[in-house]
Amino acid sequence: LAAQGRYEAALEAAVETGKRFAVHNGGNPALVAWRSQAALCLHALGDTAAAQAYAHEELELAERWGAPYAIGHALRVAGLVSPMPDAVKLLERSVEVLRASPARLELAYALVDLGTRRRRQGQTAMARSLLQEGMDLAQRCGADPVVKEARSELRALGARPRRSYLTGPEALTPSETRVAGLAATGLTNRQIAQRLYVTVKTVEVHLSN
């Protein structure tokens, strides 16, 4: 819902999820981070105070539970709904926590969010480094929306985003991985195309990458 811009409906859904979760599972934010979702929706709707209240409540709970992913995520959301310079401090803490965790995708989000705010501060070199790292990590995770956001921010800096340095299986998109896997079994391009419901040309393009 939030991705469609339906923030009021998304907020209502998040709060309702929170009520049900509290009845059955308690308050572990690592399981359902509904307060973070509510905070982002409220921020988009212009209710900054309520957004920050939800975000910091989730951060307190995350720190109580101690799971690095939950803490890093809560710090990132708190940074997104906070004014400068608090936003940068919170996002820096998020990156620090997530670097020590296996949560690679959440780290990619945090790096891009921090890089975006560094760009707004005019710290171009630092912003470029953060955004490029976040983009490379997002590419590993197959997170195209994060990659696009990072590229957009890099272009806003006047930088030309470099192509991913990744090689081998990590450099492949999910679609390319599926095609390569089928090709490795000995199927022809036409057979692969029929199996995946794509054109032979699409298969050829994937195998050429």
Predicted regions and their residues:
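Tandem amphipathic alpha-helical repeat scaffolds
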Residues: L1-Q4, L31-L45, G72-M84, Y109-R120, ...
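Alpha-solenoid helical repeat architecture
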Residues: G5-A9, F21-Q37, A62-R76, L98-A110, ...
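Inward-facing hydrophobic residues that define packing positions of alpha-helical scaffold repeats
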Residues: A13-V15, F21, Y54-A55, L91, ...
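Alpha-helical adaptor scaffolds
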Residues: H43-G46, H56-A100
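TPR/TPR-like (Sel1-like) alpha-helical repeat modules
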Residues: H56, A125-D144, R155
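Helix-turn-helix DNA-binding segment
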Residues: D113, R155, R162-N209
